[in-house]
Amino acid sequence: MLAEMFQLFGTIGIKADGAYKDLKQFEDRVQKTANGMHDKFQKAGESISHVGNKMKDVGTNMTAGVSLPLAGIGAAAVKVASDFDTSQRNIQSSLGLTEKGAENLGKIAKETWKDGFGQSIEEVDQSLIKVYQNMKEVPHEELEEATKSAMTLGKTFDSDINEVTRGAGQLMTNFGISSKEAFDLFAAGGQEGLNYSNEMFDNVAEYAPLYKQAGFSANEMFTIMANGTRDGSYNLDYINDLVKEFGIRVQDGSKGVSDAFAEMSPQTQKVWDNFNKGKGTSADVFNAVLGDLGKMDDKVKANQLGVAVFGR
């Protein structure tokens, strides 16, 4: 089962700069290798900024509607002013900020809402608060764009804002990437179908530390999930558990695992030896094994070796 799951996709080996290019290259390679077995995949990797433009278009009328009460007088203007004042107090009490700190975040929430994001200023507040709490690596000057991106992804993929920001925060913390890079990966991943079981953001938050520890990059993590998704895996947990189990088994180095590596190519055996000497990562071994399994003519043997090293 495991060999069948991965054999179409070969080794990981991503070297492109952006998430769009990475997943687009994989899409092209999969279409060519599958030789018509799959329908043409939807082009992945639309920048989050482009996705966000769609939401801003929807919000254009709201922006126009907001400008009048802000500039006008009477009850509507008083209501808006009161909402903004309440917004700042909510932010301050939720985050324990100084009055000045809450004022600065209140301005961000106000501008975000005026740009057409959220059904109310309260919704924007909660989104900004989650970005601030879960994405601690985001610089202050990027909080507005990060909030807009998080809200856009939440709406687009019908996901909770807390899960969106937790996932993005874990990508930033573990892989050292920017908020834009994290959101671009989610936009590309979502368009590749990674949220089919409605767990993409939560799974990334859970497994990002494991992938980092194993030596994978953020792009490689999403590529592995995309490969498994295209092959019809039940859910992302199944895919990520395979990677987790693989790491455990190669670290353990049981006789069954060692015997399996003895049946693989000299190149993969060398990678395995280097890993055991502390000169490589689980990711190096993972890539080498997938390369071997994909090239084997004897698919029964490939499946047996895959089960031996992956545990399934």
Give residue ranges: language-model regions.
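Short, intrinsically disordered, charge-balanced linker/junction segments flanking boundaries
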Residues: L305-R312
